[in-house]
């Protein structure tokens, strides 16, 4: 069958939500049709995977539609399989239990119905419930509640006889003490339901459970109510509840049994979650615009205000008296063991003290800080009265102390937010009112992140309330209090506009306009990031709110003061404490809702003047800036922060009833918009969205009532000399939003004059433009042009712009460097705005930002911050690429490392984008050199993913590089050799293929140079690369003959190199795509005649370069009695003109190659002279088979001489034997004797030194030996160390890439409890010290000496002493600052052996550098110096080569 089980399994496992929704119904149809799904039960494994996929991926999906579909499919499976589905119950139950706590009622209901169906058709209720007990302890309170409700439904459908209730009741009793009230209520309802089915025996059983008497009284009261109501199911009283003989412990009567277990199918299906849900689920969510009280059981601000003063009167006699009172209060509130009434009295006493003037005492505020913990505990209390009093007290503190309550408000706010979704109305409303009071009275910017973070809560109730709080905050607070969190506010409002809940969206749109009144520029930017549908919703919100029809008649007088706007949601309070709805100033002379279109064929200024005089003062477009709206339209927008003295008449309009959501239902006539292009971006920018024509323009005759100033203004005779008081309103200039300069038109001389005046009068500009919220010069200018780009973005009342210019970048950088992730995110948003404004950073700012970005690469909040960081990084690189050359190494390497991390797909794409931008922004040769350095850096241990990323990056770089960018340096040679080893990476085929592609790309990039580079490598590396290139050339030549047009995608310039290629024509032929088969080695046909001719060029080019290696790094550079010239070897070689020009970079005097810094393994001798392509000296012995046999003598001399083939015979190939030995050694902790034998055999092979063995098996052998060091058998551990030591003696050069790992494992072996192992470890460490390059060895040892404990630090110091004996004076000088701290630390160690070893190491250092050690020992005490001098003298007397003896210090 084409669409069998395997096909549907694949469909289930795919992740795309859209496809899932499409394929779900088809799958259900497939399962219901027995003819189509005949193979459903044939393959149990596939069925298991199918059910598992449905349970984990579908039912647990974040998309509720997918979850519902997943449950439908499972239901179809239950129907089809019946009792055969029983084996799958354990798979699906965890997911179904999780979904019992889902936020959507439909999901919970369907989940419960599915569980009931499983109990009926696939198993029995008891079997399912025994596997659901964990649900009573689920971390999600909704799930715990849902399990209780499911139990009630089970009892109603199947009756009590189907369950062993005595096993379930203890779990329910535990939930009676649950911290969540909804769970406690559900648990009580469960017990009541059980009582209905079982009877009085439940009452007796609960009495034995040790429950608190108060709780028992509540439960028993409910039992009595049920009994009196006549809804008991059992007719006979007192069944045997504890009897285990029956299923549920009772023997139901036939009547009750038939009533429950024989219930018809329809009746059973009728019992759904809806009937068992708590009644207040939906009402828990507040209604926007409603009062806090929300009916019976709640509280509002009036209750709070009465509670402020409804406290006993106290007197404060002294500071000490106050302090003692507060200490007693703190003691009571901090211990929830105290009686709740005592705690309530303590909370009231705080208010009493406030009324008595406690805030006037100096000791009050320190004591108040100490009460933070007590307040949190009280706000979390399970007793609602305590919570209520705590919230009233917090509100009172905020009202009395104002901003001085900043610390307490910040500390307590998160706890109070937890009350908002509480089902107990008294608790929820208390929390809401407390938060409102704090927002009104305590304007602390640190509260904003707390509010905005809760706007993303999973609870709809919390989100709705949070947007209400945000709206209140935007109305109540001054702009300067909000400036720090502009970006966070904008982001939060954007999320609210997209919220899943319609009421939250309504309030969020209201928040937007409040935000717009503070930060118009940012609001406009936010508007343009929204989709058109959301933009229209904002516009319609503005239109609907442009009316006063919903205002109460009492608030429509023209003299209504601005205070009426300052209390949204709670409304104004009359002296008697009565509340009325929120009012609005009504000064508009326009007809409500008369928004009109602008006409582009009318002069802008003329239209503006006419509009200011017309009866209709509406804005010029369907969407215009708030400044242009008639004042009366502010009824539902953010408050206007100045008091206006209104003039003119108001339009009397009959009020309309409000709907259930508290919103006005005034009729707004839908007017057609002919040719409505006003929603297009250009139109919005040009005239609608804060455009030139929005609002009254330069009309000096404008009445004072039409002016808006955002700051409190002195009236009367005030001369307003303060610069901050100079507002735009004096000149009758509106404040249009910023628009692009390209879209501004100076349409008259008036505008031109204004522009000139603006340019002349604003402060001298700095060399940069500040970002975002600081781009507002006009806030402090005496005049502003109507077309000025900044004329509407002023923030009067904030810090003047000319004082902020130097702060903006510093503040952004400080945010970016913050330890708080939200501040870092805010800083990044600010930095994005700054970069988009083309603000150029100074060198100091760049340096600091680079340091911050370097730290951000390791940001733990990857989901929250890292994604935004990557976006900012791209902009940063594009703008400042010319100044980031020094930072390129960190940038490139960190991005490549991130490619190896486990990141989300979207984040990974951003990392890749950053890499692409980096590649295109910097010189290719510089990037290539950095990558070469990164590959050979011993401190880096890239994982397989990082290796793939590096290789792919090099490949893409090689496609764009110029041939002259490829430099045959020592670093490049070592990196290429490393890449060649990666072509045989055993763990990853991706790495192997990528490495092969890179080698081919480099070969094609600069064939002569790459060929010469290969000639400098050991023969084994050459063999690996040559095989690959042979295979590639063979495949490419074949593919080019078959399809001449097939290309590899390289740019044509790559083949137009001016250098002559020593290879034959196949190198220049076009190549096909690199398929995996082309990249594999084809050893069978390697020497066949048919490809020999095409490979001759490659072979000759490699063989005709003489081979030499640099001075081997395993022997000391400092050799006594040896001259530098003796270290040279064959100076035979040939190079191209490019390498000839570079010759000087790799030469030192005497024609000897310079040692590259710590990493160079292979250097070619520079050519003596260039004599043309064939003018090279040819040495046929240089490439004999034994060229790379690592002979001890050759290693000591540190050269690969031409006659090395004469030093030993060709070794025997033990590859097959070693493979068997390794297989045996992989049996860790098993077959001890066999593995001992294998290790002994391996020891013999090690001494025979077979080249082929080590080429093929070295890495595997090393890793197995290091793993064997953890074996259970001590003899095996000791033997492994001896084998390791023998390999170190014979193959030291191979440990270069594994030095750190080998040293660490060897030192760890010193901790072994068996002396035999420790002795072997000491021998291995001693050999290791003489085998690995000294500098590399010391760099590994220094941190170990400083951080490790005894005996590892002792072994490391001893090893370091041996290394120092073979290091040169110059090299030791460079790394001495790293060495000395660890030794001085060891000199103070509690272990005498460590102290002694440290002294010996210092003596060894002194023997190398002499008196120059003295400055490093300044912190040693006199006694320690004397001891050190004693050992130095003793060493000098025993050393005949020493010429003099001197003290290190003057202390002696």
From Swiss-Prot:
Entry keyword set: Cell cycle, Cell division, Centromere, Chromosome, Cytoplasm, Cytoskeleton, Golgi apparatus, Kinetochore, Microtubule, Mitosis, Repeat
Residue ranges with Low complexity bias: 253-267, 550-569, 606-621, 645-659, 668-682, 781-792, 1034-1046
One Pfam family here: CLASP_N
InterPro entries cross-referenced by the UniProt entry: ARM-like, ARM-type_fold, CLASP_N_dom, HEAT_type_2, TOG
GO CC terms in record: centrosome; Golgi apparatus; kinetochore; microtubule; spindle
Region span, Disordered: 239-299, 545-735, 771-792, 1033-1076
Keyword Repeat: yes
Location relative to the cell: Cytoplasm, Cytoskeleton; Cytoplasm, Cytoskeleton, Microtubule organizing center, Centrosome; Chromosome, Centromere, Kinetochore; Cytoplasm, Cytoskeleton, Spindle
HEAT repeat ranges, renumbered to this chain: 68-87, 88-124, 163-200, 407-442, 443-479, 926-963, 1256-1293, 1374-1411
Gene Ontology biological-process annotations: cell division; microtubule anchoring; microtubule nucleation; microtubule organizing center organization; regulation of microtubule polymerization or depolymerization; regulation of supramolecular fiber organization
Keyword check for Cell division: yes
Biased composition (Polar residues): 573-597, 715-724, 1058-1070
Function: Microtubule plus-end tracking protein that promotes the stabilization of dynamic microtubules during anaphase. Plays a crucial role in chromatin-induced microtubule formation. May also act at microtubule minus ends. May be involved in the nucleation of noncentrosomal microtubules originating from the trans-Golgi network (TGN).
Entry similarity comment: Belongs to the CLASP family.
Subunit structure: Interacts (via C-terminus) with clip1/clip-170, and cenpe.
Protein name: CLIP-associating protein 1
Species of provenance: Xenopus tropicalis (Western clawed frog)
Source taxonomy: Eukaryota, Metazoa, Chordata, Craniata, Vertebrata
């Amino acid at each position: 069958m084409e669409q069998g089980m395997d096909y549907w399994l694949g469909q289930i496992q795919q992740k795309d939500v859209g496809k899932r929704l499409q394929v779900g119904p088809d799958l259900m149809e497939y399962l219901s049709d027995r003819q189509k799904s005949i193979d459903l039960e044939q393959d149990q494994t596939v069925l298991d995977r199918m059910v598992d996929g449905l349970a984990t991926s579908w039912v647990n999906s974040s998309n509720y539609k997918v979850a519902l579909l997943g449950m439908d499919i499972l239901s179809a499976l239950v129907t089809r399989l019946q009792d055969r589905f029983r084996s799958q119950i354990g798979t699906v139950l965890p997911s179904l239990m999780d979904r019992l706590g889902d936020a959507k009622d439909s999901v919970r209901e369907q989940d419960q119905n599915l569980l009931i169906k499983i109990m009926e058709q696939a198993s029995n209720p008891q079997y399912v419930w025994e596997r659901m007990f964990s649900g009573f302890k689920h971390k999600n309170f909704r799930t715990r509640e849902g399990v209780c409700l499911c139990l009630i439904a089970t009892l109603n459908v199947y009756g009590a006889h189907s369950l062993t209730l005595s096993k379930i009741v203890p779990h329910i009793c535990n939930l009676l003490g649950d911290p969540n009230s909804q769970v406690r209520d559900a648990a009580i309802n469960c017990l009541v339901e059980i009582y209905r089915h079982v009877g009085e025996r439940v009452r007796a059983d609960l009495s034995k459970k040790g429950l608190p008497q108060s709780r028992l009284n509540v439960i028993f009261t409910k039992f009595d109510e049920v009994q009196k109501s006549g809804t008991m199911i059992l007719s006979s009283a007192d069944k045997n509840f504890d009897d285990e003989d029956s299923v549920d412990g009772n023997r139901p009567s036939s009547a009750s049994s038939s009533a429950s277990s024989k219930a018809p199918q329809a009746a059973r299906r009728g019992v759904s979650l809806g009937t068992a849900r708590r009644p207040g689920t939906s009402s828990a969510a507040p209604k926007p615009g409603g009062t806090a009280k929300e009916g019976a059981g709640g509280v509002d601000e009036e209750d709070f205000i009465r509670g402020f003063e409804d406290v006993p009167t106290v007197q404060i006699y002294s500071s000490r008296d106050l302090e003692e009172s507060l200490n007693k209060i703190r003691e009571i509130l901090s211990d929830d063991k105290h009686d709740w009434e005592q705690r309530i009295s303590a909370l009231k006493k705080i208010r009493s003290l406030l009324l008595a003037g406690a805030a006037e005492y100096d000791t009050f505020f320190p004591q108040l800080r100490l009460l933070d913990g007590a307040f949190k505990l009280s706000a979390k209390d399970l007793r609602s009265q305590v919570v209520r009093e705590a919230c009233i007290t917090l509100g009172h503190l905020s009202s009395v102390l104002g901003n001085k309550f900043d610390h307490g408000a910040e500390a307590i706010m998160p706890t109070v937010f937890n009350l908002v979704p509480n089902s107990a109305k008294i608790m929820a409303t208390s929390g809401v009112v407390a938060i409102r009071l704090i927002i009104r009275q305590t304007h602390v910017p640190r509260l904003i992140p707390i509010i905005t973070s809760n706007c993303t809560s999973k609870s709809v109730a919390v989100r709705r309330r949070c947007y209400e709080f945000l709206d209140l905050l935007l109305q109540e607070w001054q702009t300067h209090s909000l400036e720090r969190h502009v970006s966070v506010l904008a982001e939060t409002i954007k999320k609210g506009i997209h919220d899943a809940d319609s009421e939250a969206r309504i309030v969020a749109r209201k928040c937007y306009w409040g935000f717009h009144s503070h930060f118009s520029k940012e609001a406009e930017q936010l508007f343009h990031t929204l989709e058109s549908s959301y933009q229209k919703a904002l516009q319609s919100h503005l239109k609907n709110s442009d009316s006063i029809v919903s205002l109460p008649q009492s608030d429509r007088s023209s003299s209504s003061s601005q205070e009426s706007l300052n209390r949204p949601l709670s409304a104004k309070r009359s002296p008697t404490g009565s509340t009325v709805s929120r009012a609005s100033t009504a000064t508009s002379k326009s007809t409500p809702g008369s928004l009109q279109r602008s006409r582009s064929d009318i002069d802008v200024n003329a239209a503006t003047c006419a509009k200011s005089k017309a009866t209709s003062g509406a804005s010029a477009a369907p969407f215009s800036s708030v400044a242009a709206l008639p004042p009366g339209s502010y009824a539902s927008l953010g408050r206007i922060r100045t008091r206006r003295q209104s003039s003119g008449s108001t339009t009397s309009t009959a009020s309309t009833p409000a709907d259930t959501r508290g919103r006005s239902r005034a009729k707004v006539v839908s007017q057609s918009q002919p040719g409505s292009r006003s929603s297009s971006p250009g139109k919005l920018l040009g005239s609608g969205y804060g455009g030139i024509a929005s609002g009254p323009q330069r009309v000096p005759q404008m009445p004072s009532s039409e002016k808006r100033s955002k700051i409190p203004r002195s009236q009367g005779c005030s001369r307003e000399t303060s610069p901050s008081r100079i507002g735009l309103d004096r000149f009758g200039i509106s404040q249009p939003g910023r628009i692009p300069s390209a879209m501004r038109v100076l349409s008259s001389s008036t505008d031109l004059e204004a522009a000139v005046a603006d340019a002349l009068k604003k402060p001298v500009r700095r060399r940069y433009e500040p970002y975002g919220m600081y781009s507002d010069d006009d806030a402090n200018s005496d005049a502003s042009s109507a077309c000025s780009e900044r004329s509407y973005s002023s923030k009067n009342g904030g810090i003047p712009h000319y004082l902020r210019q130097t702060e903006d970048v510093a503040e952004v950088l400080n945010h970016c460097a913050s330890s708080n992730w939200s501040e870092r995110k805010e800083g990044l948003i600010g930095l994005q705005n700054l970069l988009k404004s083309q603000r150029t950073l100074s060198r100091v700012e760049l340096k600091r930002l680079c340091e911050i970005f370097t730290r951000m690469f390791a940001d733990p909040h990857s989901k929250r911050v890292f994604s935004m960081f990557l976006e900012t990084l791209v902009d940063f690189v594009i703008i400042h690429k010319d100044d980031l050359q020094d930072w390129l190494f960190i940038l490139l390497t960190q991005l490549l490392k991130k490619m190896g991390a486990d990141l989300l797909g979207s984040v990974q794409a951003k990392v890749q984008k950053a890499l692409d931008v980096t590649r295109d922004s910097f010189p290719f040769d510089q990037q290539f050199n950095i990558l070469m350095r990164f590959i050979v850096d011993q401190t880096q241990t890239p994982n397989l993913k990082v290796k793939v990323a590096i290789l792919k990056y090099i490949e893409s770089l090689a496609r764009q590089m110029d041939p002259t960018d490829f430099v045959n340096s020592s670093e490049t040679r070592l990196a290429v050799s490393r890449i060649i080893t990666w072509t045989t990476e055993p763990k990853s085929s991706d790495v192997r293929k990528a490495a092969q592609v890179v080698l081919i790309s480099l070969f094609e990039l600069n064939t002569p140079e790459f060929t010469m580079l290969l000639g400098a490598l050991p023969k084994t590396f050459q063999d690996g690369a040559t095989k690959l290139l042979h295979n590639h050339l063979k495949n490419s030549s074949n593919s080019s003959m078959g399809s001449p047009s097939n290309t590899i995608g390289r740019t044509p310039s790559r083949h137009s190199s001016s250098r002559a290629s020593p290879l034959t024509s196949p190198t220049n032929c076009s190549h096909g795509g690199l398929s995996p088969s082309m990249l594999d080695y084809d050893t069978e046909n390697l020497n066949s005649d048919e490809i020999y001719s095409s490979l001759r060029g490659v072979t000759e080019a490699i063989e005709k370069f003489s081979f030499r290696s640099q001075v081997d790094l395993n022997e000391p550079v400092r050799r006594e009695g040896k001259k530098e010239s003796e270290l040279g070897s064959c100076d035979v070689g040939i190079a191209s003109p490019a390498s000839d020009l570079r010759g000087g970079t790799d030469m030192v005097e005497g024609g000897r190659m310079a040692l590259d810094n710590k990493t160079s393994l292979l250097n070619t001798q520079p050519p003596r002279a260039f004599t043309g392509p064939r003018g090279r000296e040819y040495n046929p012995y240089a490439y004999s088979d034994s060229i790379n046999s690592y002979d001890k003598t050759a290693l000591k001399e540190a050269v690969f001489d031409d006659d090395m083939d004469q030093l030993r015979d060709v070794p025997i190939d033990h590859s097959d034997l070693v493979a068997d030995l390794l297989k045996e050694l992989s049996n860790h902790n098993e077959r001890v004797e066999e593995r001992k034998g294998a290790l002994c055999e391996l020891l013999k092979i090690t001494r025979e030194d077979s080249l082929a063995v080590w080429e093929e098996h070295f890495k595997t052998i090393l890793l197995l030996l290091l793993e064997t060091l953890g074996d259970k058998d001590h003899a095996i551990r000791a033997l492994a160390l001896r084998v390791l030591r023998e390999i170190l003696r014979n193959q030291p050069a191979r440990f270069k890439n594994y030095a750190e790992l080998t040293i660490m494992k060897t030192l760890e072996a010193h901790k072994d409890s068996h002396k035999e192992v420790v002795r072997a470890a000491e021998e291995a460490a001693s050999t290791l010290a003489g085998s690995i390059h000294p500098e590399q060895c010391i760099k590994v040892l220094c941190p170990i000496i400083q951080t490790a404990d005894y005996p590892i630090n002792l072994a490391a110091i001893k090893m370091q002493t041996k290394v120092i004996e073979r290091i040169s004076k110059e090299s030791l000088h460079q790394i001495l600052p790293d060495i000395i701290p660890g030794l001085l630390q060891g000199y103070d160690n509690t272990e005498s052996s460590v102290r002694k070893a440290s002294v010996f190491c210092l003596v060894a250092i002194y023997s190398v550098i002499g008196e120059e050690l003295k400055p490093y020992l300044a912190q040693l005490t006199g006694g320690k110096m004397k001891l050190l001098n004693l050992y130095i003298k003793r060493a000098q007397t025993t050393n005949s080569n020493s010429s003099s003896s001197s003290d290190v210090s003057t202390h002696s």
